[in-house]
UniProtKB/Swiss-Prot annotation:
Active site: S237 (charge relay system), D344 (charge relay system), H393 (charge relay system)
Protein name: Palmitoleoyl-protein carboxylesterase notum1a
GO biological process: anterior/posterior pattern specification; negative regulation of canonical Wnt signaling pathway; negative regulation of Wnt signaling pathway; neural tube patterning; protein depalmitoleylation; Wnt signaling pathway
GO MF annotations in UniProt: glycosylphosphatidylinositol phospholipase D activity; palmitoleyl hydrolase activity
Secreted in keyword set: yes
Glycosylation sites recorded in the entry for this protein: N101
UniProt similarity note: Belongs to the pectinacetylesterase family. Notum subfamily.
GO cellular component term, pick one: extracellular region
PANTHER family, A to Z: NOTUM-RELATED (PTHR21562), PALMITOLEOYL-PROTEIN CARBOXYLESTERASE NOTUM (PTHR21562:SF7)
Length: 500
């Protein structure tokens, strides 16, 4: 009875706060203030099943531990009712800021920077590292500068940027992090966020990825990060690898500056690469065809690359190993959540498997299946991870990031469960929340055997394909594959259709 009364009191005061905020906003508009700004469509009712409270007021969840789901449903509905008020004054765009330390630059010497959307009252910060491959010698860096200058220079960066997926400010697109402070760091160092060498007369390009991250964190301290409770360092592709390389150093930097109460965590998306043998070995002449190990061996010298100290000690003299997730992960001290497609397109590209619409040879099929198996094996001891059996690359900034599921759980739900499990751990509660999985990996063995995978389109016609059409299109032999698996072809087709 006391708990129910407490919940109702919290909701009562929150509603009163909402009415005051709405009333004040309406009064300002009635008095003839600024012209009302056009605003985006409000979130659908579906958000009520997926949203989460903002951080405008503090809640003691331990008081309703036994009835948490019911309590959260009420608070989610409250957040939905609050949203129309806040939407009228919400600024969705992140704004460009250049680093105060102008000696830390992009490849071409232009100033590095970041995009920021502040969320007043929130003590959660999401710092995102952009991806975009790399270059590892003067020749392919020159080529990259001619064809992809945005990834090496800030000279034409726009003044604002709108976040998508997990960087979105819309609760229907980003149910658990929409009200966080959002930071997007553009990738302009071409060094997998590892470099620490400036541009000089001898060096045509600066490689300062690791320094850019540190300078952004320093600059953000004066913009509210000093009061943060949680800092989530996230990234996709090269940015995902950058998370693995930098999450501990970010935490150590904050501790050195006296901010010991900020919990630093990592979220690595599509950055868990394997140093496996290529399907077809080629000379290391460009970024795409060069074997992953050879790229990093050459790149780490060219960039003046820095790796985490514990990993450096584990692989002294062979520090290139630290760029591969399954090798660096055991040395990382901070909690990191891994998001990885089991059939990652970038991994297949560097392994010289090019799915361009031509029928895939039998040897390529075996290689692709083995890749999924290898990835599963490297992820089996990772406690917090989400690995769908899909053919894709990058995830958390896609607009479909809430739709893909593994074993009935979406990525936003898994991340929320992870967040809760870390909170419980900090309270010395060793057991994870019931019905809240954080170790999610598909077991089906083919690309796109999960029916919730992103849509595949025929490259020649643009038409959508289901998984069976896709596999047939790529030369998949149902009879032969069923025979290899020791099952009836119709049963195999049923499994592919259901994703089992």
């Amino acid at each position: 009875m006391k708990r129910s009364l407490w919940v109702m009191q919290v909701l009562h005061w929150a509603v009163m706060l909402a009415l005051v905020q709405c009333g004040a906003l309406g009064a300002r508009r009635f008095r003839g203030g600024r012209n009302p700004q056009p605003r985006r469509a409000l979130p659908s009712a579906h958000y009520r099943d997926r949203g989460e409270t903002t951080e405008s007021f503090s809640l003691d969840f331990t008081a309703v531990e036994e009835n948490m789901d019911n309590f959260m449903t009420q608070v989610k509905n409250l957040a939905q009712s609050l949203y129309p008020c806040s939407a009228q004054k919400l600024d969705y765009d992140m704004k460009l800021h250049f680093l105060e330390n102008t000696s830390v630059t992009c490849n071409d010497g232009t100033p590095a920077g970041y995009y920021l959307k502040e969320s007043k009252g929130s003590k959660r910060w999401l710092i995102f590292l952009e991806g975009g491959w790399y270059c590892f010698n003067k020749e392919n860096c020159d080529s990259r500068y001619e064809t992809m200058r945005r990834l090496m220079s800030s000279s034409k960066w726009p003044q604002t940027k709108t976040g998508t997926g997990m960087l979105s400010s819309l609760p229907e697109e980003n149910p658990h992090w929409w009200n966080a402070n959002m930071v997007f760091i553009p990738y302009c160092s071409s060094d997998v966020w590892s470099g620490a060498s400036p541009k000089t007369d001898q060096n045509d390009y600066a490689f300062m990825g690791s320094l850019i991250i540190k300078e952004v964190v320093k600059d953000l301290l004066s913009k509210g990060l000093d009061n943060a409770k949680i800092l989530l360092l996230a990234g996709s592709s090269a940015g995902g690898t950058g998370v693995l390389l930098n999450v501990d150093s970010v935490s150590e930097l904050l501790e050195e500056l006296g901010h010991t109460n900020i919990q630093v965590r990592g979220l690595s998306d599509s950055g868990w690469f394997l140093d496996n043998k290529q399907y077809r070995c080629t000379d290391c002449v460009d970024t795409i065809n060069c074997a992953p190990t050879e790229v990093i061996k050459r790149g780490i010298k060219y960039w003046g690359g820095v790796v985490p100290e514990r990993c450096r000690q584990a692989y002294e003299g062979k520090e290139w190993n630290c760029f591969f997730g399954y090798k660096v992960y055991p040395t990382i001290k901070r909690p990191v959540f891994i998001v990885q497609w089991l059939f990652d397109e970038a991994q297949l590209t560097v392994d010289n498997i090019h799915l361009t619409g031509q029928p895939v040879q039998e040897g390529q099929w075996r290689y692709i299946q083995n890749l999924g198996t290898e990835l599963r094996n490297t992820l089996k001891d990772v406690p917090a991870m989400f690995a769908p059996a899909c053919l894709s690359h990058e995830f958390i900034t896609r607009n479909y990031w809430t739709d893909v599921q593994v074993k009935g759980t979406s990525l936003p739900r898994a991340l929320h469960c992870w967040d809760r499990s870390l909170q419980d751990t900090s309270r010395n509660n060793k057991s994870p929340p019931k019905g809240c999985p954080v170790h999610l990996i598909d077991s089906c063995p083919w690309p796109h055997c999960n029916p919730t995978c992103p849509t595949i389109r025929d490259q020649s016609t643009g038409q959508e394909m289901n998984v069976i059409q896709f596999l047939m299109h790529m030369g998949f032999d149902v009879q032969k594959m069923a025979h290899q698996q020791g099952m009836d072809p119709s049963k195999l087709l049923g499994m592919l259709s259901s994703g089992s």
